[in-house]
UniProtKB/Swiss-Prot annotation:
InterPro entries: Ribosomal_uL3 (IPR000597), Ribosomal_uL3_bac/org-type (IPR019927), Ribosomal_uL3_CS (IPR019926), Transl_B-barrel_sf (IPR009000). Belongs to the universal ribosomal protein uL3 family. This is Large ribosomal subunit protein uL3. Keywords: Ribonucleoprotein, Ribosomal protein, RNA-binding, rRNA-binding. GO terms for cellular component: cytosolic large ribosomal subunit. SUPFAM superfamilies: Translation proteins. It comes from Crocosphaera subtropica (strain ATCC 51142 / BH68). Part of the 50S ribosomal subunit. Forms a cluster with proteins L14 and L19. One of the primary rRNA binding proteins, it binds directly near the 3'-end of the 23S rRNA, where it nucleates assembly of the 50S subunit. Pfam families: Ribosomal_L3 (PF00297). GO terms for biological process: translation. Residues 133-156 are annotated as: Disordered. One of its GO terms (molecular function) is structural constituent of ribosome.
Length: 212
């Protein structure tokens, strides 16, 4: 697995292609800068990986174990830590900054985040059920319909699509294209939408291509 970045979703806008003039919807992501806080090797940990930290905060926002872990490498208090497996750790050093310039325009990335929470939602909003007739004496407008058989099995099977909590779960959108990289401000312009609300934490990794 290649090293990725932690970032923050800032919002959406659009840019225009110079040649065709087409408008491209893009999400602006604050990608890093992240700090390498730990390097794991096969000799000491059984596998090779690097750990990065993101989002500097006040010391009181972290626990003493977290502060002690970061002080070992003389890193600032960082809110989020994330580990990425790598084939070779020799090219990385403790305290090194990982920035948005690890990606280039045209790269494909996978972005994981927490989807927007929509609270307790019904059948139509949560599962796209078709509603009943609104006229002709129908009393079945937004009801679910049948939830299963009768005496046998005498219960509703687990996993039945019903009303409930919608959103606020970890989700990944795959194979999104990096349209533009602003290395000075550590910004990525990603084509299309990414999970979550503005201000949400994102995990940005090179896209996993099947067969490669």
């Amino acid at each position: 697995m290649a090293v990725g970045l932690l970032g923050t979703k800032l919002g959406m806008t659009q840019i225009f292609e110079e040649e065709s003039g087409l408008a491209i919807p893009v999400t602006v992501v604050q990608a890093g800068p992240c700090t390498i806080t730990q390097i794991k090797t096969a000799e000491t940990d059984g596998y090779s990986a690097i750990q990065i930290g993101y989002l500097e905060v006040k010391e009181k926002a972290l626990t003493k174990p977290e502060l002690g872990h970061l002080k070992k490498v003389e890193a600032s208090p960082l809110r989020h830590l994330k580990e990425y497996r790598v084939d070779d750790t020799a090219t990385y050093t403790l305290g090194e900054a990982v920035k948005a310039d690890i990606f280039n325009a045209g790269d494909l990335v996978d972005i994981a985040g927490t989807s927007m929470g929509r609270g307790f939602a019904g059948y139509q909003k949560r599962h796209n059920f078709k509603r009943g007739s609104m006229t002709h004496g129908s009393k079945n407008h937004r009801l679910p319909g049948s939830t299963g058989a009768g005496t046998t099995p005498g219960r509703v099977y687990p996993g039945k699509k019903m009303a409930g909590q919608y959103g606020a779960v970890k989700t990944t959108t795959r194979h999104l294209q990096v349209v533009r990289v602003d290395a000075e401000r550590n910004l990525l312009l990603i084509k299309g939408a990414v999970p979550g609300k503005p201000g949400g934490l994102l995990n940005i990794t090179p896209a996993k291509i099947v067969g490669k």
